[in-house]
Amino acid sequence: GSEMCIRDSYNSDGKYIINLDSDGMLEKNALVNMITRFENDTAINCMTGSILTVPEQIKKYKAGPSRLLRELEFMEYAQAFLAGRSYASELNSVYTLSGAFSAFRKSAVLKSWMYNTDTICEDTHITFQMRYLQKERVEVCEDALFFVDPIENVNKLYTQRQRWQRGSLEVSKMFMDKSFKVKNLFTNISVKTLLYDHTFAFPRPVSYTHLTLPTKA
């Protein structure tokens, strides 16, 4: 989907290219906030929005493990985008654009290899292109909010995190010759982020949820 949209952009007349997941929902001012950020800083060529789960949908679940899973997921997204990536944005160390909501200046995208379908994490691949090949800043627009449905169940959450892990490893391998090496653990933020994600961040909601589930006698 994303790859086809980017390729179709060759024939577009617009100044910006914005990718959105079809099953999410934009906050009413999200696009205005993002384009305003682009217009106010011509040095920015790619940004990710802030992704959150829909709070109203979380309240529909019965109190207990089911609701707790969705509450933990919401807090994880809030921490990742409104705190973690916002701070990383200031240091130009955002690991990946969000596949659910990201935006580019068309001029920057047309210099890239576009989305790569050899990996299941095309969003991470184009992020690495921007950072390592084109030397672009990758930033977060904190007030450009995009809401997604809460995860369906623990199995879906596990599958989602497994897919993210696999994708990040695939992309890392593709960029091993672009300073993405283990020897750069203490100097390259992407290496540190990869190691952290594969030890603490990705399994966190699954682990928290299992700790709260009642055990059989």
Where are these regions (language model features)?
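Conserved small/polar residues in nucleotide/adenosyl-binding loops
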Residues: 1-9, 209-215
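Long helical/loop segments within the catalytic core of UDP-sugar-dependent glycosyltransferases
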Residues: 7, 33-119, 162-165, 169, ...
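Short aromatic/hydrophobic "clamp" motif used to bind/position activated sugar donors
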Residues: 17
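The conserved acidic donor/metal-binding loop of glycosyltransferases
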Residues: 21-25
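Acidic donor-diphosphate engagement hotspot in glycosyltransferases and nucleotidyltransferases
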Residues: 29-31
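Basic/Trp-rich segment in TM-proximal cytosolic loops or flexible interdomain/linker regions
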Residues: 91-92, 152-211
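Acidic donor-binding loop at a coil-to-helix junction in glycosyltransferase catalytic cores
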Residues: 120-126
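Catalytic donor-sugar/metal-binding loop of nucleotide-sugar-dependent glycosyltransferases
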Residues: 129-146
